[in-house]
From Swiss-Prot:
Coiled coil: none
Gene: mutS
Binding positions for ATP per the UniProt entry: 622-629
Function: This protein is involved in the repair of mismatches in DNA. It is possible that it carries out the mismatch recognition step. This protein has a weak ATPase activity.
Keyword field: ATP-binding, DNA damage, DNA repair, DNA-binding, Nucleotide-binding
TM regions (residue ranges): none
Pfam families: MutS_I (PF01624), MutS_II (PF05188), MutS_III (PF05192), MutS_IV (PF05190), MutS_V (PF00488)
Gene3D superfamilies to which the protein is assigned, alphabetical: 1.10.1420.10, 6.10.140.430, DNA repair protein MutS, domain I, MutS, connector domain, P-loop containing nucleotide triphosphate hydrolases
Organism classification: Bacteria, Pseudomonadati, Pseudomonadota, Gammaproteobacteria, Legionellales
Record carries keyword Glycosyltransferase: no
InterPro entries linked to this entry: DNA_mismatch_repair_MutS, DNA_mismatch_repair_MutS-lik_N, DNA_mismatch_repair_MutS/MSH, DNA_mismatch_repair_MutS_C, DNA_mismatch_repair_MutS_clamp, DNA_mismatch_repair_MutS_core, DNA_mismatch_repair_MutS_N, DNA_mismatch_repair_MutS_sf
Protein name in the entry: DNA mismatch repair protein MutS
Length: 859
């Protein structure tokens, strides 16, 4: 049998297909780019191209179903009871899915069972708990571009957080994409920019990016006449993006969105700018392999609630510049740290659950019974949290948290009365509403569960009333409930008995009372289920009325959770409160790398960092593995921790205003873009030199190493000089070009430091201690020996090093700056006569050897 290889959904004429396939194809035509899960009995089936794609992605069997239009139909399916597992996998792969349910009764349908689309699941609009990562915001992002400006709108539908901003460069745009890491990204079909860092990218038609339409949609959503009250009217591109976003969410949700009741502008100047490279290099949310272990978030996240965990990551991803707000956070941490108040608060917070997403599902009317059970538990904890905060000396931050927690006594009592202690997962089969909550429901349940006792009582009652001792009450599927009397006593049957069936030895009757009971019992289960669903919807209505205070409560709990966690981390990890200053300074006493210290078995060597107006750049030298990169990263991480309001891994820290953190650490080929290691390095360096300011912290490691010695040295020298003299940024500049240490003699704001090491019996011992002044040796052979280079190779290298060091030695230990880049005009022998064999480093010797070879070749 030949499988149809092309989906017929693009054809207008479906007449050649079976009625059921015509129904499917009409639905599929409305959603050509989405996978359609089409309910058929106990399975969701996929057909044609959808089936082939799903079979590959989900590793399920591709088969065929009969014929339609003369061809076998490719088909794949999944059981309805396991569909959530398959949906989770598809969403994580960036796919979008349409769920098409049977809404008709197969027993009464004359043609195909009626079906309709009940859910559209896309990566950025999913709200089901099973499909979400509880530690990560699930963000939908829209970008609207006009020339070199970009409007950005983001929405986390699982919280209602709706944000917009405008950006004026592609570098800043990509930095935002890296920060937000949207689950789904929408751009116009006319966009020229191609961001590649989102899990799922979709192009939307240009007409969805209409400013006037956006204004109308947003005003309708927020039930306002204008957007003036939101303070966003100066962001027309972002408003247009928000309009497209709202259209898309309305399209996917097919329901009201009452939890989206506000929109906020993100001001770029409020936060430290951290570009994509810096986020990766500092391993803020994930390590360099893309995993969370050994990242800053991994170290800090001891939160008690999922929403606290997500908020902590938002804080890490967006450090603030407002020192007043940061001081408030720090003061709150100090209060929670005192007498270890954080411990008792944590014990209560861990019973809250994911209140933020539960409230969103209530708003979307997709909350499940266990969501309401968890909400009830959370509301029950609030009075204790209130009391715990009341007992503390509250600063402004903690007072706001307490005020926004709220007390929901009525809702708590309602949920206590309405929902059983341990409800089932879904409302579908009932058993959710507690006995005693609703009298009609109780009556229906009693009829269903206690019908046998009713029949016993009725039989006894009728025997006594009629004096017929052979009277029985029975039931069969055909005739239902009946009263049975023997033929011998049938003449004694009361007149109100209505004959229903005559058998050989008995007569069977029905009475009005029994008929009423029969109707009630036979329909009681379905009626009880319908009543239960009705009551459940009424509960959701009641909860939706309290949506805004519940959202405020969830936000307050998340903030309390993060501050509480920072207090616990400060106590456990020996962090101390930094001091904020209004003048330029980064002064860290006994600073430590928080993650390296945590994973090491040996004690970590703390080091000082001192940068100020007269000391803006440190040229850092020392051996590989000596700790240069760790030292630079720890300085950046301590700064970043302070700017999220955390305590820091240092004995003391003073920090002035910081606007940006840049890193140029490590590099690799970008084969996808056709860029070499050196090109990647120079692109990152260029971004720093174009964007750093006097208030920036810049980390640069081994600039220039990806090209020839003299090209690299020249570039490193020029970049360091530019940073120190033109930008005047705070900079840590690690290098193996010893010649760069000469900068300190000509530029007062440049200082030399090195990471110390000692040599013992041809082995190197790294002290990891920062010392003033330049390093006097690179220890390259010793590091190579530690790396496992064969001993014979090391011995050969040592012999070669001695040969290079002996004949070629410079006159001075540190050549003057103006001699570094002069062209060599003397012949080889003249140059040799000018050299002195005592003080050159191995690298200097090798460089001069290459120089002499070049001179010789020119002769």
């Amino acid at each position: 049998m030949e499988l149809q290889t092309k989906s017929p959904t693009t054809q207008n004429d479906f007449s050649q297909h079976t009625p059921m396939m015509r129904q499917y194809l009409r639905i599929k035509a409305e959603y050509p780019d989405l996978l359609v899960f089409y309910r058929m009995g106990d399975f969701y089936e996929l057909f044609y191209d959808d089936a082939k794609k799903a079979a590959k992605l989900l590793n399920i069997t591709l088969t065929a179903r009969g014929q339609s239009a003369g061809h076998a139909i490719p088909m794949a399916g999944v059981p309805y009871h396991a569909v959530e597992n398959y949906l989770t996998k598809l969403v994580r792969l960036g796919e979008s899915v349409v769920i098409c349910e049977q809404i008709g009764d197969p027993a009464t349908s004359k043609g195909p069972v009626a079906r309709e689309v009940t859910r559209i699941i896309t990566p950025g609009t999913v709200s089901d708990e099973a499909l979400l990562d509880e530690h990560r915001d699930n963000t939908l992002m829209v970008i609207h571009q006009e020339k070199d400006r970009f409007g950005i709108a983001t929405l986390d539908i699982t919280s209602g957080r709706f944000l917009i901003q405008e950006i004026i460069s592609e570098n800043a745009l990509f930095a935002e994409i890296e920060r937000i890491r949207p689950a789904e990204l929408l751009i116009s079909e006319e966009n020229s920019v191609h961001p590649l860092k989102a899990d799922s990218i979709k192009r939307r038609p240009p007409w969805e990016f209409d400013h006037a339409t956006a204004l109308t949609l947003l005003c309708q959503q927020f039930q306002t006449k204008s957007l003036d009250g939101f303070g966003i009217t100066h962001l027309p591109l972002a408003i247009t993006a928000a309009g497209c976003l709202l259209q898309y969410v309305n399209y996917t949700q097919k329901s009201a969105l009452p939890h989206i009741h506000s929109i906020q502008a993100e001001q770029n100047e409020e936060a430290l700018f951290i570009d994509a490279n810096t986020r990766r290099n500092l391993e803020l949310i994930t390590n360099l392999q893309g995993e969370e272990v050994h990242s800053l978030a991994w170290l800090l996240d001891h939160t008690a609630t999922p929403m606290g965990s997500r908020l902590l990551r938002r804080w890490i991803n967006r450090p603030l510049r407002d020192q007043i707000l940061l001081q408030q956070r720090q003061n709150a941490v100090s209060t929670l740290l005192e007498k270890r108040n954080y411990s008792e608060i944590y014990e209560n917070l861990r019973h809250i659950g994911d209140l933020e997403r539960i409230v969103a599902r209530i708003a979307l009317r997709s909350a499940r019974p266990r969501d309401l059970m968890q909400l009830r538990q959370a509301l029950g904890v609030l009075p204790t949290l209130h009391q715990q905060l009341t007992n503390l000396p509250l600063n402004k931050q903690l007072q706001e948290i307490k005020n926004n927690l709220g007390l929901f006594d009525e809702l708590f009592r309602l949920l206590q009365k309405a929902i059983i202690e341990n409800p089932p997962i879904v409302i579908r089969d009932g058993g959710v509403i507690a006995d005693g909550y609703d009298a009609p429901l109780d009556e229906l349940r009693n009829m269903s569960t206690n019908s046998h006792q009713f029949l016993i009582d009725l039989e006894q009652q009728e025997r006594e009333r009629t004096k017929i001792n052979t009277l029985k009450v029975g039931y069969n599927r055909i005739h239902g409930y009946y009263i049975e009397i023997s033929r011998a006593q049938a003449k004694q049957a009361p007149t109100e008995y209505i004959r229903r069936q005559t058998l050989k030895n008995v007569e069977r009757y029905i009475t009005p009372e029994l008929k009423i009971f029969e109707d009630k019992v036979l329909s009681s289960r379905s009626r009880a289920l319908a009543r239960e669903k009705e009551l459940y919807e009424q509960l959701l209505d009641t909860l939706i009325e309290k949506l805004i205070p519940l959202q405020q409560c969830a936000s307050a709990i998340a903030n309390l959770d993060v501050l509480n966690t920072l207090a616990e981390r400060a106590d456990t990890l020996n962090f101390n409160a930094p001091q904020f200053c209004d003048y330029p300074i980064i002064k860290i006493e006994a600073g430590r790398h928080p993650i390296v210290e945590n994973v090491m078995t040996d004690p970590f060597m703390p080091n000082d960092t001192h940068l100020d107006e007269k000391r803006r750049m440190l040229i850092i030298t020392g051996p590989n593995m000596g700790g240069k990169s760790t030292y630079m990263r720890q300085t950046a991480l301590i700064t970043l921790l302070a700017y999220i309001g955390s305590f820091v891994p240092a004995k003391n820290a003073q920090l002035g205003p910081i606007d940006r953190i840049f890193t140029r650490i490590g590099a690799a080929d970008d084969l996808a873009s056709g860029r070499s290691t050196f090109m990647v390095e120079m692109t990152e360096t260029a971004a720093i030199l174009h964007n750093a300011t006097e208030e920036s912290l810049v980390l640069m490691d081994e600039v220039g190493r990806g090209t020839s010695t003299f090209d690299g040295l020249s570039l490193a020298y020029a970049c360091a000089s530019y940073l120190a003299t033109k930008l005047k940024a705070f900079a840590l500049f690690a290098t193996h070009y010893f010649e760069l240490t000469a900068l300190a003699s000509t530029l007062p704001a440049v200082k030399n430091v090195h990471l110390d090491a000692v040599e013992h019996e041809e082995k190197i011992i790294f002290l990891h201690a920062l010392r003033e002044g330049p390093a006097n040796k690179s220890y390259g052979l010793q590091v190579a020996q530690l790396a496992g280079i064969p001993r014979s190779v090391i011995q050969h290298a040592r012999q070669k090093l001695e040969e290079l060091e002996n004949p070629v030695i410079s006159e001075t230990q540190q050549p003057q700056q103006n001699e570094l880049f002069l062209p060599i005009e003397n012949p080889v022998l003249t140059q040799l006569d000018k050299l002195n064999p005592d003080n050159l480093t191995p690298k200097q010797a090798l460089d001069i050897l290459y120089q002499l070879i070049q001179l010789r070749q020119q002769k």
